[in-house]
């Protein structure tokens, strides 16, 4: 019997922004894997809301609402994994933002593929599966 591998994808904030800007490569890949196989973190939603408040544009608040409806959300719950990631990076003299470490912790603990345009940033985290949908294939 052949077992099929079925990835579930966690979309980083930059991918959601690219989707809202109608990035052809992100839209194409989303169609290939299906929106039902893509999730976001509450952290991503928080970052999108920050951008909406920063811009002050009603359209951006509407965009966040659409993203929120489109994708299932993972709550912030992998606090211990965040601490481990932060400690491991600090021991190596490396640093990424706290929000990104929470997103990475979710991807690791839930066995998700993290989709980001910032692969170099996240590849510092051992064991994290990362894809860049912003690159054209």
Question: Which residue ranges define each predicted feature?
Answer:
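C-terminal structural segments of small proteins and small subunits
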Residues: 119-121
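Short, glycine/acidic-enriched loop or turn micro-motifs at the edges of active sites
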Residues: 15, 21
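PIN-domain endoribonuclease scaffold, especially VapC-family toxins
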Residues: 2-11, 24-109, 113, 129-137
């Amino acid at each position: 019997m052949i077992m099929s591998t079925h990835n579930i994808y966690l979309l980083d904030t930059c991918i959601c922004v690219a989707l809202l800007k109608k990035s052809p490569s992100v839209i194409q890949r989303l169609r290939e894997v299906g929106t039902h196989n893509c999730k976001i973190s509450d952290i991503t939603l928080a970052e999108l809301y920050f951008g909406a408040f920063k811009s002050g544009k009603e359209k951006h608040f509407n965009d966040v609402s659409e993203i929120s409806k489109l994708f299932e959300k993972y709550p912030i719950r992998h606090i211990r994994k965040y601490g481990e990631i932060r400690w491991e990076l600090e021991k190596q003299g490396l640093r990424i933002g706290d929000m990104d470490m929470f997103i990475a912790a979710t991807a690791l603990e839930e066995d998700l593929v993290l989709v980001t345009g910032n692969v170099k940033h996240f590849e510092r985290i051992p064991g994290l599966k990362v894809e860049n949908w912003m690159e054209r294939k």
